[in-house]
Amino acid sequence: MHTPLLDLTGLTREALTSLVVEQLGEKPFRARQLWSWLHVKLAQHLDEMSDLSIDFRRKLSALSTPLRPEVSTHQISRDGTEKWLLRLSDGQQIETVYIPEDERGTLCISSQVGCTLSCPFCHTGAQGFARNLTPSEIVQQVLFARRTLAARDKRVTNIVLMGMGEPLYNYEAVRDAVLILLDDSGLAFGTRKVTLSTAGLLPKMEQAGRELGVNLAISLHAVRDTLRDELVPLNKKYNLQALRAATLRYPLKSGRRVTWEYVMLHGVNDSEDDARLFVSFLKDIPSKINLIPFNPWPGVPYQSSSMTRIAAFQKILYQAGFVTVIRDRRGEDIDAACGQLKGAVQGARPRPPGAS
């Protein structure tokens, strides 16, 4: 029976050590060398790994293959934001976005081809859902960006899982990928530098809190159940009361806050009454709010709230004591802004119950 070849970059350090020692019969230090080549030196080929014996490299070659994505398109926005459309080994395509700032560079990575959810204002959700990404396909976005940007003296300092997909519907792969990103002997992103975003898949959200300890961002978008049922259909399964209760239980590390993402839709969710309901919803939850001017895409029935309306909404939240930021429309001219990513989904499949 044919055994699929591994991509070594998708193995946690523990899994890689087990493979090298138990399956290949090598010493543990060989696993450490291999890990360093993959996640510190960012090697792309076994031939580059000059301090590994030829015999060891032959063993690795027999059971593994690098599944590096190919660049289909690369766009750079007027504001410096960059977007890559990456082709995977099966021909599916995902989008990865780099957002440069003065003191940091944030990489927005995808976790699915398409999205399990079907939020009607989001271009990704409109594409349907094809499949989950593997751990290596998630990690490879970071390795690719680090190599590519380093050649231009740019750094990736922060990771946000806010690209295509609902990360928690692909939790096992996302967990392994995040553990690889966090590993101190490799890419070494601190837990404060990685943000996991979810629309509120509550059982997995609580599991992520226990197992990963990274920053949490929740795509809220409405503070009335009837409206959130429409904008975020997952709300029909896990409503606002359940979401609030789960967030209160979430094991936040000292000094950290939950980030709430709220897209501002003209005449839909942007009233002052909505802002006051938002304040009530956040009671006793250490929170930061990102208000996101809606980024339109062809055929969508929504419009963005005016900046005057957004500022009035912000003022109510701010006066209640919450840090509230109006997010810049980074990358809007290349469709790289929030809600605009679409990739190229082939053979979309039905979504799981409760996702739409």
From Swiss-Prot:
What are the binding positions for [4Fe-4S] cluster in this chain? C115, C119, C122
Chief localisation class: cytoplasm
Which positions does UniProt annotate for S-adenosyl-L-methionine binding?
Answer: G165, E166, S197, S219, L220, H221, N295
UniProt lists the gene as: rlmN
Active site: residue positions: E95 (proton acceptor), C338 (s-methylcysteine intermediate)
Describe cofactor binding as the record notes it.
Binds 1 [4Fe-4S] cluster. The cluster is coordinated with 3 cysteines and an exchangeable S-adenosyl-L-methionine.
The family database entries (InterPro entries) matched by this protein are listed as: Aldolase_TIM, Methyltransferase_A, RlmN_N, RNA_MTrfase_RlmN, rRNA_lsu_MTrfase_RlmN/Cfr, rSAM
- Compartments in which it is found: Cytoplasm
Q: Which HAMAP family match?
A: RNA_methyltr_RlmN (MF_01849)
Q: Which UniProt key words apply to this protein?
A: 4Fe-4S, Cytoplasm, Disulfide bond, Iron, Iron-sulfur, Metal-binding, Methyltransferase, rRNA processing, S-adenosyl-L-methionine, Transferase, tRNA processing
Top EC class, one word: transferase
Q: Which Pfam families match?
A: Radical_SAM, RlmN_N
Q: One GO cellular component from the entry? A: cytoplasm
Further comment found in the protein's record: Reaction proceeds by a ping-pong mechanism involving intermediate methylation of a conserved cysteine residue.
Enzyme Commission number(s) of this protein: 2.1.1.192
- Give the protein name, as stated in the record: Dual-specificity RNA methyltransferase RlmN
